[in-house]
Regions:
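Charged, glycine-rich intrinsically disordered N-terminal tails and low-complexity linkers that flank
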Residues: 1-93, 135-137
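An acidic intrinsically disordered interaction segment
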Residues: 3-10, 148-167, 224-232
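Short alpha-helix boundary/capping segments
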Residues: 30-31, 183-190
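Short amphipathic alpha-helical face segments that pack within enzyme cores
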Residues: 38, 190-198
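Catalytic cores of nuclease domains that cleave nucleic-acid phosphodiester backbones
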Residues: 62-175
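Metal-dependent nuclease catalytic regions and adjoining charged, substrate-binding loops involved
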Residues: 151-154, 182-186, 198-270
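Glycine- and acidic
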Residues: 175-181
Length: 270
């Protein structure tokens, strides 16, 4: 089964995808790669344990302000960062990662996550909910690192963030990037559309649009039938590659500069 990230990887360079996914070659680990994996791990642990916060009924009451909720989440995040770093001491030492710098980057990248959640918690508390009922009735509810799978599409993925608004009966997938983006690139469009399709199947309701949150820029993508067909065609094209084992060249050969797979790519033509 393909992963959503496989689709964007194939779009970037079919040959890189071929060597990674079909031949089984691996890129050498680098400091940025390890830092990225640690950031994703923090987000994953954050998402998996967020509901447990609301079991402490005494900590959440009708007098809890957004500022206090924000502090509540910040302390929660800080504990998770320490936990992930403690469990990854070997990698951190091997790749000479500055823990304090990475900690600040993670906190910065999670600022909006915490802000959105704090606003939602404050508004739901005002409706009289506390504790577990508060979690169950949060609206809008933001869920990070949500695993999704579709047997019919042959596709799976983990959405960076989704927003569920029960009042408006709306579900919105978000793709988060650290870089600013002037526009939605084809790879972003494929990822956003893929997550929308996976969510439509999971929740059995239409997903009209998705959002790319890239650095300080926000772009909205309307999910059309044409977008969906592009995803289906791409899935079929990639599945065909597993049979033919004849990958296409990238659309732009500037991508070949400093590519780890250059030697393997040249030997493929022999």
């Amino acid at each position: 089964m393909l992963n959503v990230t496989d689709l964007s990887s194939y779009l970037y360079c079919p040959r890189q995808f071929y060597f990674r996914k079909i031949v089984g070659l691996r890129d050498p680990a680098t400091q940025p790669m390890i830092e990225g994996s640690l950031r994703h791990k923090v987000r994953e642990v954050f998402a998996n344990n967020e509901e447990n916060l609301f079991e402490n009924l005494e900590l959440i009451n009708n007098n809890l302000t957004k500022q206090k909720v924000t502090s509540f989440y910040q302390n929660f995040l800080d504990q998770i960062i320490k936990q992930v770093f403690n469990n990854s001491q070997g990698l951190i030492y091997k790749f000479r990662i500055n823990k304090e710098e990475l900690r600040e980057k993670i906190i910065k990248s999670m600022e909006n996550e915490i802000k959105l959640r704090a606003e939602s918690v404050e508004n739901t508390i005002k409706q009289g909910f506390t504790g577990k009922e508060l979690w169950e009735n949060l609206t809008p509810k933001y869920i990070s690192e949500l695993p999704l799978i579709s047997e019919s599409l042959g596709l799976k993925g983990r959405a960076d963030r989704i927003m569920i608004d029960k009042n408006k009966q709306t579900i919105i997938p978000f793709e988060l990037k650290t870089r600013d983006a002037k526009t939605i690139y084809p790879s972003d469009e494929v990822q956003l559309t893929s997550y929308a399709m996976l969510l439509e199947e999971k929740y059995n309701q239409p997903i009209p649009f998705a959002i790319l949150e890239a650095g300080n820029t926000i772009h909205e993508l309307t999910i059309t039938d044409s977008n969906k067909q592009k995803v289906r065609d791409l899935i079929n094209e990639i599945n065909e590659l597993f049979k033919t084992k004849k990958p296409k060249f990238p659309s732009n050969f500037s991508k070949c500069q400093n590519c780890f797979f250059t030697q393997h790519c040249e030997s493929l033509e022999d």
